[in-house]
Amino acid sequence: MENHSETPVLQQHRVLVANRGEIAIRIMQACIKLGIPFTAIYTAEDKDSGHVLFAREHGDGKALYRVSSYHDANELMSVADISGCTALHPGYGFFAEDFRFARRVTKRDRSMIFIGPSWKIIRELGDKINTKRLARSLGVPTVPGSDRPTYDEMEAENIAEEVFDFQLRHSIEHPLVLIKASAGGGGMGIEEVDDIDQFRSVYRRVRNYAARQFKDEGVLIEQRIMDYNHVEVQILGDRHGHQVHFGTRNCSIQSTGRQKRLEVAPGFDPSVNKYSFDSDRVLQDITTYSLSIARKVGYDSAGTWEWIVTRDGNPFLMEVNTRIQVENGVSAKISRIKGHDGIDLVAEQI
């Protein structure tokens, strides 16, 4: 990594930047650093936005195309063909974690490189329940609860009763159960229940929301863990079997809508805060656990492993985000490759 000896080969490619805004600019900047031409897209509403201005200033005659929607896969493929793109970077959001889209990019008659994990890995790790089952098979700790999609109301209620009983047996003062859309993400499709008598109505609401938003009624029932740190492990892998981590981030400061507001790196810093547990040991454990999953599936791009760490220092894996993220720049700031800083994780991903 950071040895761009293949740059002459890279220059034979053109990257379709299938996104907008901040991440589109980061992708274009990485392409410029690597000497790769790019093609950006924009909608009528975005004609004066930053990524459009950047593409006009730094791109060539095929650097910018107008589309009707960032969500129209057919239109993206058409732009790729017209401009001669050989690779596509989805950024985050939109198609970034859509394994069907990634498969289409690589399997179409005029195939392109999908700059992200393989579609099979996105499919495997993109489902929280698949990830949970894989983690448990490797001895990686996960939040107590179901490890497969639940579609039956009675089955879901039985699981919820077991989770409530588990918390009562462990003298948890205010037992709570989370009902989560298994295909959800970004804090969407999650509600909590503190009374089993209220379970069915909340379950139906989450199930209906999941069907509308994610086209999948699958629901995950888990213990609601209170008073925790939300810690992330930044992973990067290549297609030659190498996976490494770029440290940890703490994103516990979030809005009421579970949107991250502040990222701190590393995940714990005993020189700043005092902890009731061995914070260095916990960070070592979660990076080791994260890499074990990455190596098991042959992870081959940038990704983030999301963890809950309780106030007693017990870590539980929540999910894997199979994409580049807004906060990847925080990890880059605390990392070095062969003693050199100035890391660009988007460039490394490409």
Which residues fall in each region the model found?
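N-terminal cationic-hydrophobic initiation segments that often serve targeting/anchoring roles
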Residues: 80, 164-168, 211
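ATP-dependent carboxylate activation and anion-phosphoryl transfer catalytic cores
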Residues: 3-38, 60, 71, 81-83, ...
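Generic detection of short hydrophobic beta-strand segments and adjacent strand-loop junctions
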Residues: 148-150, 191-194
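Active-site helix-to-loop segments that bind/position phosphate- or nucleotide-bearing substrates
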Residues: 142
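N-terminal loops that bind phosphate or other acidic moieties
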Residues: 153, 157-166, 204
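ATP-binding N-terminal substructure of ATP-dependent carboxylate-amine bond-forming enzymes
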Residues: 1-138, 147-159
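Acidic/histidine-enriched active-site and ligand-binding environments that engage anionic O-linkages
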Residues: 160-179
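A residue-identity detector for tryptophan
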Residues: 54, 119, 164-166, 246, ...
